[in-house]
Amino acid sequence: MRDGMRPLGVVLPVYNEGSVPADLVGRMPAIVDRVFVVDDGSTDDGPDLAERAGAEVIRHGSRRGAGAAIRSGLFAARDRGMAAVVVMAGNGKDDPTEVPHVVAPLDEGYDYVQGSRFLRGGSFRNLPRSRHLLIKAYTVAFRLLTGFAASDVTNGFRAYRVSLLSDPRIKLDQQWLDGYELEYYLHYKAVTLPYRVLEVPVSKNYPSGKRDYSKMRPIIDWWHGVRPVLFLALRIRD
């Protein structure tokens, strides 16, 4: 990564993830200038451990939602003068050593980079079959609505030019985006506005034999991911 996209920030949204965020902070590659851990109302000591590991911790007084946490991290990166920002899972499913690979296209002129476990060179482990099928179905629907040849729309490992966040057509500061909606809203905007978007292969590793591999609730939270795409496509929201 050239100095043109420095400084680089990484956002880790967390909710009761124990020592995992601190471990992720310690494994960040040298190109990462700041790590923003957004504590969305955790009741454990995970955010304190992450702070001691060197992260800047942004604390929500109560649980506000995944979108609210990501928004807080993105806005913090912008306000601290980051040129580029990566969002990745705070629960250990994403590999910090892949950050240079994910941000590299920004140096080539891309504005937004989407990680994909399904591209050649990507991988996934312990992905529940039911979730795999839902991801594939959602991705097909997204492709039909946007015309963008996506392969893994739900993957939260992403990189952005921070300047994208100041586009007045991208209105992240809307309360209805506080849940999982924000990620899909931003993805839809990036691929339908005149931005350069690229998918790159990444790995995604789910814990073996762990039932709570995700905070997402079946049906309810999947609807939260679907509705921003429908609302934007039908021009119900902007």
Predicted regions and their residues:
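Terminal low-complexity segments of carbohydrate-biosynthetic enzymes
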Residues: 1-9, 108, 224-238
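N-proximal low-complexity "stem/linker" segments adjacent to membrane-targeting elements
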Residues: 1-27
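Short beta-strand/loop segment that forms part of the nucleotide-sugar
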Residues: 12, 24-25, 33-42, 58
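Acidic helix N-cap motif at the loop->helix transition within catalytic regions
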Residues: 19-23, 44-53
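A conserved acidic beta->alpha catalytic loop
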Residues: 39-47, 92
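Acceptor/aglycone-binding surface of glycosyltransferases and processive sugar-polymer synthases
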Residues: 61-79, 96-180, 206-216, 220-226
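Short beta-strand-to-loop acidic/aromatic patch adjacent to the donor-nucleotide binding site
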Residues: 82-93
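Catalytic donor-sugar/metal-binding loop of nucleotide-sugar-dependent glycosyltransferases
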Residues: 174-176, 187-205
